[in-house]
Amino acid sequence: MTDSIPKKPFKKGSLVFVDRENYIKSIEALASDDDLPNYVFEGPGEILSVKDEYAQVRWRRPVPDVWLKLDQLKEYTQ
């Protein structure tokens, strides 16, 4: 069999930012504030936990951690 278990693209400690285009098209965006702060799109945020298709992200600011879908996140590179 050539089927393999897909690896999670991100793990605890990964640095990420939110992909604006994927976020805006998501159902989560409809349930949230339209005006997200720029730092979520610029990054980096650190993944604290991954569960199913969601990741808990902590930003380097005094704000609460958030859960975002993995397909809305991209790897942060300097």
UniProtKB/Swiss-Prot annotation:
Keyword Translocase belongs to the record: yes
Membrane topology summary: Peripheral membrane protein
Self-association and partners: NDH-1 can be composed of about 15 different subunits; different subcomplexes with different compositions have been identified which probably have different functions.
Entry function: NDH-1 shuttles electrons from an unknown electron donor, via FMN and iron-sulfur (Fe-S) centers, to quinones in the respiratory and/or the photosynthetic chain. The immediate electron acceptor for the enzyme in this species is believed to be plastoquinone. Couples the redox reaction to proton translocation, and thus conserves the redox energy in a proton gradient. Cyanobacterial NDH-1 also plays a role in inorganic carbon-concentration.
Catalytically driven reaction(s): a plastoquinone + NADH + (n+1) H(+)(in) = a plastoquinol + NAD(+) + n H(+)(out); a plastoquinone + NADPH + (n+1) H(+)(in) = a plastoquinol + NADP(+) + n H(+)(out)
Protein name in the entry: NAD(P)H-quinone oxidoreductase subunit O
Organism encoding this protein: Prochlorococcus marinus (strain MIT 9215)
Localization of this protein: Cellular thylakoid membrane
